[in-house]
Design a protein with these regions (language model features):
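A short, proline-enriched helix->beta-strand linker immediately N-terminal to the Walker B motif
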Residues: 44-48
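ABC ATPase "signature
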Residues: 109-110
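Conserved ABC ATPase signature
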Residues: 25-29, 33
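A short, surface-exposed alpha-helical micro-motif characterized by mixed small hydrophobic
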Residues: 91-93
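Hydrophobic anchor residue at the start of the ABC signature
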Residues: 39
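H-loop/switch region of ABC-family ATPase nucleotide-binding domains
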Residues: 85-86
Length: 138
């Protein structure tokens, strides 16, 4: 890297809380750190929007918060994001719109407040109950 590219990379790693890891190899980083490096790499292209497909599903539970916090920060900065997630609490807090899918089809969509407090579809209600029960058990 040289000059502007290196400055940009370091700024993005700093934004991800990883400036001190800039010269580490991938195997020296945790799963959450690797995921944040991937986000920084994508941001280097200055996209208008980003797609996150289960960005936290392969992470240890204690690392999930790191990645969700970065995504929360991007949302607060106005980044357009399409997020596929089972992290319902996060979705309720961050989303402008929620789309519920079942078997590859959209079954319900709307503002988070409506979807999470008064879903129209029985399948959505069943899914949300299962997520809430799982959370209570842990």
């Amino acid at each position: 890297m040289c000059g502007k590219a290196e400055e940009r990379a370091m700024a993005l790693l700093g934004k991800m809380g990883l400036a001190s890891k800039a010269y580490n190899y991938p195997h020296e980083l945790s799963g959450g750190q690797q995921q944040r490096v991937a986000i920084a790499r994508a941001l280097a292209m200055q996209p208008k929007g980003m797609l996150f497909d289960e960005a936290t599903s392969a992470l240890d539970p204690e690392l999930i918060g790191e990645v969700l916090e970065v995504m929360r920060q991007l949302a607060s900065e106005g980044m357009t994001m399409v997020i596929v997630t089972h992290e319902m609490e996060f979705a309720a807090q961050v989303a402008d719109r929620v789309v519920v899918m079942d078997a590859g089809r959209i079954i319900e969509q709307g503002p988070p407040k409506v979807i999470f407090s008064n879903p129209a579809q029985e399948r959505t209600r069943k899914f949300l109950r299962a997520v809430i029960e799982r959370k209570v058990e842990t």
